Amino acid sequence: MNLDEMTKVGMADLKVGKSPDVLTTLGLGSCVGVAIYDPVTKISGLLHCMLPDSTQFRNNSNKAKYADSGIDELVAQMLKLGASKVRLVAKIAGGAQMFAMNTNNDTLRVGERNVAAVKMKLSELNIRLLSEDCGLNYGRTVEFYSETGEYVIKSVGKPR
């Protein structure tokens, strides 16, 4: 399938779809791509979140920018399409540390914090995390297939 036939999810964005839709997001560095799926209805959602916590910012109107509010919004849109909350499962990718930092300053460890926030929100919503490809120091591009629930991760700059 070529990129023109896929639904593109931008940075700080989310999209929902259903079979046979394919959702894709490019350039996940410290950001996290959160794919949520209902295997019975084949309703899917993909979030490209940039930051862990919307409560730390005054201007937080873009819910998709943050892990906490983005996952809530993604699930809400999927339920409106007919997904069942009890069947939802998730797969995640991203959360890299793209630049070498010799510090213990948590503020600079955005990738790790994003992954932790995503996992916490999924757990809070009782959405089972099936798989993850997170961390390290390379980017990722993902494709999420609504027909099968397959989450294809393409690594960018991954050491061999």
Q: Which residue stretches match the model-derived regions?
A:
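Phosphate-centric recognition/catalysis
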Residues: 1, 5-24, 40
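General beta-strand structural signal in soluble alpha/beta enzymes
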Residues: 9, 18, 24, 46, ...
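Short, basic and Ser/Thr-rich N-terminal targeting/leader segments
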Residues: 10, 28-30, 138
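Conserved mixed alpha/beta catalytic, RNA-binding, or beta-rich assembly cores of soluble enzyme
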Residues: 24-81
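Acidic, glycine-rich active-site loops and adjacent beta-strand->loop/helix elements
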Residues: 50-55, 94-98, 135-137
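Short glycine-rich phosphate-binding loop at a beta-alpha junction
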Residues: 86-94
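Phosphate/ribose-phosphate-bearing ligand recognition and processing surfaces
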Residues: 97-111
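Divalent-metal-activated hydrolytic enzyme cores
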Residues: 107-160
